Amino acid sequence: MSTIEERVKIIISEQLGVKKEEVVNTASFVDDLGADSLDTVELVMALEEEFNTEIPDEEAEKITTVQAAIDFIQSSR
């Protein structure tokens, strides 16, 4: 089974239509990966579905980088 980090990166790559190599831990969804506000909402929904968790809106607003997404999912396990 893939690690949480690998799974998060795959979801980000697929949702934002970017190459997996571009999805580095320090990458910002908006500044580095070209996401807009709708992309980030869809990304949060995809993460919720993949990891069977709920991400409250106030937490979702803080998830702006690849590492922030990984950290949130790991802390919710």
UniProtKB/Swiss-Prot annotation:
Carrier of the growing fatty acid chain in fatty acid biosynthesis. It comes from the Bacteria. It is found in: Cytoplasm. Pfam families: PP-binding. This is Acyl carrier protein. GO terms for molecular function: acyl binding; acyl carrier activity. The modification O-(pantetheine 4'-phosphoryl)serine is found at S37. One of its GO terms (biological process) is lipid A biosynthetic process. Gene3D superfamilies: ACP-like (1.10.1200.10). Disulfide bonds: none annotated. Pathway: Lipid metabolism; fatty acid biosynthesis. It comes from Baumannia cicadellinicola subsp. Homalodisca coagulata.
